[in-house]
From Swiss-Prot:
Organism of this sequence: Syntrophobacter fumaroxidans (strain DSM 10017 / MPOB)
Binding site for NADP(+): 166-168, 195, 236
InterPro entries: Aminoacid_DH-like_N_sf, NAD(P)-bd_dom_sf, THF_DH/CycHdrlase, THF_DH/CycHdrlase_cat_dom, THF_DH/CycHdrlase_CS, THF_DH/CycHdrlase_NAD-bd_dom
Cellular component terms (Gene Ontology): cytosol
Protein name in the entry: Bifunctional protein FolD
Record field: catalytic activity: (6R)-5,10-methylene-5,6,7,8-tetrahydrofolate + NADP(+) = (6R)-5,10-methenyltetrahydrofolate + NADPH; (6R)-5,10-methenyltetrahydrofolate + H2O = (6R)-10-formyltetrahydrofolate + H(+)
Pathway(s) served: One-carbon metabolism; tetrahydrofolate interconversion
Gene that encodes the chain: folD
GO annotation (BP), single: methionine biosynthetic process
Length: 295
């Protein structure tokens, strides 16, 4: 029996509708709108595409949205000055620096310079620490999207065996921290696999919920999945192009095999990806309320 598709695009649309109502209420009752600035250094085509998608969503929701494009040779100190300006701007509640940055700029130094209360990506060590102790102001966007997708699909997370393949600071580590907390949509037992894990399949076959963020196309095969498991495929890998030049994308899970074993699975594209930008918008609305002391 083919698995149910967990279509993040549809869930993200529902959440955006909720956020739009919230933004309208912020404006009508309190006279404020969420403000988001996206800083793009250079002309990386993929980064330009991501920034465009974020800006389009922000406009759709009625945000005060600023796109600050800077040349690839921008000096690091100039970028720090820009961030300082937005840190002090009361109309801006969220600051997003699009990564990767040019090699001459120290990414860690840049991310550390963002006011943690405006760090809507939740990358700042202050926000990572708050997540660790279970008191986050903002949740990292892709893990938050995964958790929201699990909750809204009715997946039983509490008490579940969850295996995460990948230990990145953006997905693997934070989703492990989130799902182990004493909280709704959490209370799971977590295993994290990585490049030094021996016999990854022995861990993935135990998982009631399998989250794969390995960065390798079709790394997890159907025979590595527990029958009836819920599979969250975070990977987006370009494996070629069609005759008319369109990208061919594959996830980190061999979809055609997995769909015959799992009870539910996210497609690629259209699964986790759309949730990430939507959760960024949710964090920005939250930041607006925090800065304006709105409960």
């Amino acid at each position: 029996m083919a698995a149910k598709l967990l279509k993040g695009a549809e869930v993200a649309k529902e959440i955006r509708a909720e956020l739009k109502t919230e933004v309208e209420q912020l404006q009508s009752k309190h006279g404020v709108v969420p403000g988001l600035v996206t800083i793009l250094v250079g002309e990386n085509p993929a980064s330009q595409s991501y920034v465009r998608a974020k800006q389009n969503t922000a406009h759709e929701l009625g945000f005060h949205s600023v796109q600050d494009n800077q040349p690839a040779d921008l000096e690091e100190n100039r970028l720090l000055d820009l961030i300082d300006k937005y840190n002090k701007d009361p109309s801006i509640h969220g600051i997003l620096v699009q990564l990767p940055l040019p090699k001459h700029i120290n990414e860690n130094r840049i991310l550390l310079s963002i006011d943690p209360s405006k760090d809507v990506d939740a990358f700042h060590p202050v926000n990572v620490g708050k997540l660790m102790i279970g008191e986050p102001d903002y949740l990292p966007c892709t893990p938050a999207g995964i958790q929201e997708l699990l909750v809204r699909s009715g997946t039983q997370v509490s008490g579940a065996e969850v295996t995460i393949v990948g230990r990145s600071n953006i997905v693997g580590k934070p989703i492990a921290m989130m799902l182990v907390q004493k909280a709704n949509g959490a209370n799971a037992t977590i295993t994290v696999c990585h490049t030094r894990t021996k016999d990854v399949a022995s861990h993935t076959r135990r998982a009631d919920i399998l989250i794969v963020a390995a960065g390798v196309a079709e790394y997890v095969k159907g025979n590595m999945i527990k029958p009836g498991a819920v599979v969250i495929d975070v990977g987006v890998n370009e494996v070629g192009k069609t005759a008319d030049g369109k990208r061919i994308l594959k996830g980190d899970v061999a979809f055609d095999e997995a769909v015959e074993v799992a009870s539910a699975i996210t497609p690629v594209p259209g699964g986790v990806g759309p949730m990430t930008i939507t959760m960024l918008m949710k964090n920005t609305v939250r930041a607006c309320k925090v800065h304006n002391k709105i409960a």
